[in-house]
Design a protein with these regions (language model features):
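Small/polar/charged residue-enriched interaction surfaces, especially the RNA/DNA-contacting tracks
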Residues: 1-132
Length: 132
């Protein structure tokens, strides 16, 4: 029922990257160092990461199979987004990496036969209110 598309950096964030000096195409490399306790030997490492505040466009397709379950399904999905915001993606979450947030939901119904589009603002409000 749910189709998750790849997330791509949106145009606004892409223009921001064009104006700043980054280590990679659209990221930065953070150098860290740990010390081996037994030997006192330094163990340098580098982590490539997306800079804080980078925004992505997100497309999720929900195939309506039962109209009566639509609101309940959106509430469950909103709860999942909320839980994801309380956790992290990828590694090093205890250091604050991988934190995400969701905003500016736009939900519409698309009739597959006619192509007609109808905004579903009440469902977008459910999502906006559920996230942090």
């Amino acid at each position: 029922r749910l189709q998750f598309s790849d997330l791509f950096i949106n145009r606004k964030a892409e223009r921001k990257f064009e104006k700043i000096d980054t280590d990679t195409y659209m990221g930065e490399v953070k150098f860290e160092n740990t010390i081996e306790r037994g030997t006192g030997t330094a163990m340098p490492r580098q982590i490539e990461r997306v800079p804080r505040g980078t925004t992505f466009d997100f497309l999720l397709i929900y195939n309506i199979e039962n109209e009566e379950e639509l609101n309940e399904d959106m509430e469950v999905l909103a709860q999942g987004f909320r839980l994801l915001q309380l956790d992290y993606l990828g590694g090093h979450g205890s250091r604050g990496y991988g934190r995400v947030s969701f905003s500016d939901f736009f939900i519409e119904r698309i009739d597959i036969e006619t192509g007609d589009r109808e905004p579903l603002d009440d469902l977008a409000d459910i999502m906006d209110k559920a996230v942090l």
